[in-house]
Swiss-Prot record:
Recorded GO CC terms: plasma membrane
Record topological domains on the Extracellular side: 1-26, 81-101, 159-195, 260-272
Intervals, Cytoplasmic compartment: 51-58, 121-139, 220-236, 293-323
Transmembrane helix in keyword set: yes
Function statement: Odorant receptor.
Organism: Homo sapiens
Domain of life where this protein originates: Eukaryota
This protein's record includes keyword Lyase: no
Descriptive protein name: Olfactory receptor 2T35
Bridged cysteine pairs (disulfide): C98-C189
Membrane topology reported for the UniProt record: Multi-pass membrane protein
Keywords: Cell membrane, Disulfide bond, G-protein coupled receptor, Glycoprotein, Membrane, Olfaction, Receptor, Sensory transduction, Transducer, Transmembrane, Transmembrane helix
């Protein structure tokens, strides 16, 4: 039996990878692994800083910690398998493993909602500062975050079983480096056009609702900032919002290409590059954008490093005295 026959009768899929036949797989492995380490470290540090420093116990940083958790999930669900495939000739992924990837990656819908809520948080902080403690109290924040996670999870619970229920009789080779729904559906030997249309409508809706919140929020913020007499107030307002605008631009740019543009604009190579952008690069960029442009986060990091340095000095001094 040839390779094609084996693939058709296997319960596994085969991932072709980010680059089908990389000229320098070792170099690609080193680059992706470095990005992975930086992304994981940056997001975990962000989560720990927000948890440990009482000055960061505010709605904005609580939402930011949830963003870091989601980004950690995205990169952990795709990159380890990608790195394994770069080192191994066996590029198979089990049916269950593929379904797990699809489910967790549909949580990206939750990140859309979370970015919309972060824009609303900035709107309240800039336009209604006196009512901020009331409008963004702990109960409201928890409700908003739970809603984001539930929204993304419901998307996964609906799309994953339907996608994996189609018969895959053409091939088991997925032209991608992870199980993305459009790439998996190309293997089906039945008509998936109705499902793809419904999925397209669902994705557009999940994009437009948060994007509308973001657009309205920042329109009000710009109008409020324009009416400010204080140059310091304007600078602070722009500094507060600029990091979020950068993250939204990067994330929604990739999402717009993937979910909104018609099929004629898509090629497997372009799709893989864009997917790498939002599953690998964005989780690395998000915490860096927020931390490098945020004095509170930088101060919290210095405080933690100072504690570590003091503890180490005390240990060394104790050892010297005992010696």
């Amino acid at each position: 039996m040839g390779m094609e026959g084996l693939l058709q009768n296997s319960t596994n899929f085969v991932l072709t990878g980010l680059i089908t036949h990389p000229a320098f797989p070792g170099l690609l492995f080193a680059v992706v692994f470095s990005i992975f380490v930086v992304a994981i470290t940056a997001n975990l540090v962000m989560i720990l800083l927000i948890h440990m420093d009482s000055r960061l116990h505010t709605p904005m940083y609580f939402l930011l910690s949830q963003l870091s958790i989601m980004d950690t999930i995205y990169i952990c669900i795709t990159v380890p398998k990608m790195l394994q495939d770069l080192l191994s000739k066996d590029k198979t992924i089990s049916f269950l493993g593929c379904a797990v990837q699809i489910f967790y990656l549909t949580l990206i819908g939750g990140e859309f909602f979370l970015l919309g809520l972060m824009a609303y948080d900035r709107y309240v902080a800039v336009c209604n500062p006196l009512r901020y403690p009331l409008l963004m109290n702990r109960r409201v924040c928890l409700f908003m975050v739970v809603g984001s996670w539930v929204g993304g999870s419901l998307d996964g619970f609906m799309l994953t079983p339907v996608t994996m229920s189609f018969p895959f009789c053409r091939s088991r080779e997925i032209n991608h480096f992870f199980c993305e729904i459009p790439a998996v559906l190309k293997l089906s030997c039945t008509d998936t056009s109705l499902y793809e249309t419904l999925m397209y409508a669902c994705c557009v809706l999940m994009l437009l609702i948060p994007l509308s919140v973001i657009s309205v929020s920042y329109t009000h913020i710009l109008l409020t900032v324009h009416r400010m007499n204080s140059a310091e107030g304007r600078r602070k307002a722009f500094a507060t919002c600029s990091s979020h605008i950068m993250v939204v631009s990067v994330f929604y740019g990739a999402a717009f290409y993937t979910n909104v543009l018609p099929h004629s604009y898509h090629t497997p190579e372009k799709d893989k590059v864009v997917s790498a952008f939002y599953t690998i690069l964005t989780p690395m960029l998000n915490p860096l954008i927020y931390s490098l442009r945020n004095k509170d986060v930088a101060a919290a990091l210095r405080k933690v490093l100072g504690r570590c340095g003091s503890s180490q000095s005390i240990r060394v001094a104790t050892v010297i005295r005992k010696g």
